[in-house]
C-alpha cells in the first residue's frame, strides 16, 4: 500500500511529530513483540475498550448489515462515534478499504 502523506492536516506540526514518533514506536514494539505491554502502558482500560469498539464499528459498517442506530444499540457507542467512523471510512483510500475488508471480513469474523 502506498502512503499518500505522513502529515495529518488535522494536527499541528508538533502534533504530527508526536504522532509519527508514536507510530514508529508502535512499529518497533511489534517487531520486538512488545506491542501488548506498550499499549497497556500508554492506554487506559477505557481507551483500549474504545479502540476495540471503533474496530467493531468499522467492521460492522463494512459488513453493511446494520443501520447506524442498530450499531449504536448493539455496541453501546454514541451515534456521533459511529458517524465519525462512517465518515472516516468514506474518506479512506481504496487500498486501505480493501486491506480492512481482508482483515475484518476475510474470515467472516
UniProtKB/Swiss-Prot annotation:
Predominant subcellular localization, coarse grouping: cytoplasm
Key words of the record: Cytoplasm, DNA-binding, Repressor, Transcription, Transcription regulation
GO biological process: negative regulation of DNA-templated transcription
UniProt-annotated location(s): Cytoplasm
Tagged with keyword Phosphoprotein: no
GO cellular component, one term: cytoplasm
A Pfam family that the UniProt record links to this protein: Trp_repressor
Entry's Gene Ontology molecular function annotations: DNA-binding transcription factor activity; sequence-specific DNA binding
Coiled-coil zones: none
Source domain of life: Bacteria
DNA-binding region boundaries: 68-91
Assembly, per entry: Homodimer.
Functional summary from the UniProt entry: This protein is an aporepressor. When complexed with L-tryptophan it binds the operator region of the trp operon (5'-ACTAGT-'3') and prevents the initiation of transcription. The complex also regulates trp repressor biosynthesis by binding to its regulatory region.
Family: Belongs to the TrpR family.
Protein's name according to its UniProt entry: Trp operon repressor
Organism name: Serratia proteamaculans (strain 568)
Lineage: Bacteria, Pseudomonadati, Pseudomonadota, Gammaproteobacteria, Enterobacterales
Amino acid at each position: 500500500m502506498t502512503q499518500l502523506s505522513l502529515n495529518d492536516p488535522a494536527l499541528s506540526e508538533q502534533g504530527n511529530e508526536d504522532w509519527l514518533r508514536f507510530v514508529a514506536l508502535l512499529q518497533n514494539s511489534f517487531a520486538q513483540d512488545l506491542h501488548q505491554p506498550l499499549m497497556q502502558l500508554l492506554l487506559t482500560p477505557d481507551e483500549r475498550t474504545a479502540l476495540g469498539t471503533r474496530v467493531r464499528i468499522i467492521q460492522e459498517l463494512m459488513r453493511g448489515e446494520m443501520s447506524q442506530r442498530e450499531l449504536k444499540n448493539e455496541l453501546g457507542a454514541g451515534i456521533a462515534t459511529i458517524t465519525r467512523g462512517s465518515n472516516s471510512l468514506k474518506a479512506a483510500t481504496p487500498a486501505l478499504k480493501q486491506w480492512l475488508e481482508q482483515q475484518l471480513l476475510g474470515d467472516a469474523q
